[in-house]
Amino acid sequence: MSRLEQLGKFRERLIKKRDEVFETHRFSDEARLILSEHDIEPEETAQKEAIADVLAILDEKELEDIQAINRALARMKLGEYSSCEVCGKGIEVERLEAIPWTSVCSKHARTE
């Protein structure tokens, strides 16, 4: 597979992952709306708060994922996608296949 084909494959995976994260976020918004619309018994308040906390954590994680994916796509446009941001050496293809939005090689991933 040529480098250009490989980059195209990674780009498709990044966009697909971003779409999945957006879909998860949409589900979180719907769940939050359902929680706010229904009158609940006082005993259920703690459960509702726990669910809201989980949704907030998901929102943070989703935002981080989207930002990482967008950074990877931007690095791709700049021709820097497969280079480690720390040392400038190439990021292992196996690592990119596992985590296509990564910006560091496996050596520097262990130090972060």
Which residues are covered by each model-predicted region?
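Interaction interfaces in information-processing and related assembly proteins
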Residues: 1-78
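Flexible coil/turn residues that form the inter-helical turn or adjacent wing/linker of helix-turn-helix
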Residues: 80, 89
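Short microdomains enriched in Cys/His and/or Lys/Arg
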Residues: 103-112
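Short, cysteine/histidine-rich loop/knuckle motifs that typically chelate Zn2+
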Residues: 86-87, 107
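A short beta-strand motif that forms part of the nucleic acid-binding face
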Residues: 88, 100
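Short Cys/His-rich "knuckle" micro-motifs
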Residues: 94-99
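Residues immediately within or flanking Cys/His clusters that coordinate Zn2+
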Residues: 81, 102
